[in-house]
Amino acid sequence: MRRILNNFSTTIAMFVLAIPNGVSAQMNSAEAHAGPAMNYHRVDDRLATGGHFVDGGLADLHGQGVKVVIDLRDKPPSGQKEKLAKLGIEWINIPVVWKAPKQRDFDRFSRAMSKHQDDNVLVQCQANYRASAMTYLYRVVVEKVPEKDAKEDLRAVWEPNDLWQDYMNGIIETAP
């Protein structure tokens, strides 16, 4: 009987300890999916970053006046360009391989961003990691935003892993 009570007590204790983690995970999931795209983050009135679109996300983008989506996924969903075009939104795909970002990726991204510097732009990838990192780089290298300020927006989305931190450091160190 004592063993049964001990096992029962242990099970109850584990369940009670797991509840806050489950609630936190649900809140994080809800937070991650707020806005038109996963991990959506508005940098300013003309620039936002986000991951894949959530339900109703395309209509939300249109309602926010987004004119251009720069998609950094190396394998974007088919039909993305057509869906956005129906809403009057231009779609630009600059494939950036998650595990192997290159200098040329940043160069192409910078050209697209500079071309659309006066437009309302969403920079997108799968989870808003590539998008927020490339946006951070563009703001620091091209727009000359203080690194501390740009980093706040980057960290609102994620803390870059070693590969991406090294990539960003390399771009910044070699920038004119």
Feature map (PLM): residue ranges:
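Positively charged n-region of N-terminal signal peptides that target proteins for export
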Residues: 1-7
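Short, surface-exposed ligand- or partner-binding patches at beta-edge/loop junctions that are enriched
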Residues: 124
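Cys-dependent protein tyrosine phosphatase-like superfamily
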Residues: 22-121, 133-176
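Bacterial N-terminal signal peptides
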Residues: 9-22
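A periodicity- and composition-biased signal for non-globular, repetitive helical segments
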Residues: 8-9, 136
